[in-house]
């Protein structure tokens, strides 16, 4: 994971109110998402993930490039939990709260009995993953695995406590003195 580590150590840091953000291609789509970074992450997720599944599930927006790359390499279709309602038959709405926002998320394209893997860009507070798990449980899906690329904060512990699910992550970080530190 040398490319991911190098890119994290050199990414810009911005302060918004009380929260310190790291700006990274995987979490923000800027400054530029390079193919070697996506390739490295995709290869690692395929290596460690339980891909004996019917569908890959991700959250809008930055989980989409990851799910797309994994889908192209594995021929497993993916569904996106969206921030917008489509009012399709069987659509499932769940409430999401993260460290910086709250709102509704909408799941379509998942059926009872589907085996799924969840992939996402960042795990910090656990709010997005908890909402995904809730939606998938309502749909009657079986969650086989959960993988997030970057871990920051206590989200892994919070998800385990609130849902019983373990989240795998590729790299744990913190922002200390205006820099990303790999833990």
UniProtKB/Swiss-Prot annotation:
Spans traversing the lipid bilayer: none
Metabolic or biological pathway: Purine metabolism; IMP biosynthesis via salvage pathway; IMP from hypoxanthine: step 1/1
Top-level EC class: transferase
Gene Ontology MF terms: guanine phosphoribosyltransferase activity; hypoxanthine phosphoribosyltransferase activity
PANTHER family: HYPOXANTHINE/GUANINE PHOSPHORIBOSYLTRANSFERASE, XANTHINE PHOSPHORIBOSYLTRANSFERASE
Keywords per UniProt: Cytoplasm, Glycosyltransferase, Purine salvage, Transferase
UniProt-listed GO biological process terms: IMP salvage; purine ribonucleoside salvage
EC number: 2.4.2.8
CC per GO annotation: cytoplasm
Taxonomic source organism: Methanococcus aeolicus (strain ATCC BAA-1280 / DSM 17508 / OCM 812 / Nankai-3)
Family: Belongs to the purine/pyrimidine phosphoribosyltransferase family. Archaeal HPRT subfamily.
Protein name (record): Hypoxanthine/guanine phosphoribosyltransferase
Lineage top rank: taxon: Archaea
Oligomer and partners: Homodimer.
Cited function: Catalyzes a salvage reaction resulting in the formation of IMP that is energically less costly than de novo synthesis.
Compartments where found: Cytoplasm
Pfam families in UniProt: Pribosyltran
CDD domains found in the cross-reference section: PRTases_typeI (cd06223)
Catalytic reaction list: IMP + diphosphate = hypoxanthine + 5-phospho-alpha-D-ribose 1-diphosphate; GMP + diphosphate = guanine + 5-phospho-alpha-D-ribose 1-diphosphate
């Amino acid at each position: 994971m040398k490319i991911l580590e190098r890119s994290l150590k050199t990414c810009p840091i911005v302060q918004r109110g009380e929260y310190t953000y790291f700006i990274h291609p995987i979490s923000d789509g800027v400054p530029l998402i390079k193919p070697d970074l996506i390739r490295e992450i995709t290869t690692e997720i395929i290596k460690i993930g339980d891909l004996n599944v019917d569908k890959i599930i991700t959250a809008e927006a930055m989980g989409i490039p990851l799910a797309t790359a994994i889908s192209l390499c594995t021929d497993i279709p993916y569904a996106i939990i969206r921030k917008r309602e489509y009012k399709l038959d069987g659509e499932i709405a769940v409430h999401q709260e993260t460290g910086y926002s709250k709102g509704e998320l909408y799941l379509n394209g998942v059926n009872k009995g589907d085996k799924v893997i969840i992939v996402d860009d960042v795990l910090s507070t656990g709010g997005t993953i908890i909402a995904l798990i809730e939606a998938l449980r309502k749909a009657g899906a079986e969650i086989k695995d959960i993988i997030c690329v970057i871990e920051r904060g206590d989200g892994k512990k919070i998800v385990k406590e609130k849902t019983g699910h373990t989240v795998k992550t590729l790299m744990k970080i913190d922002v200390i003195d205006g820099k990303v530190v790999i833990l």
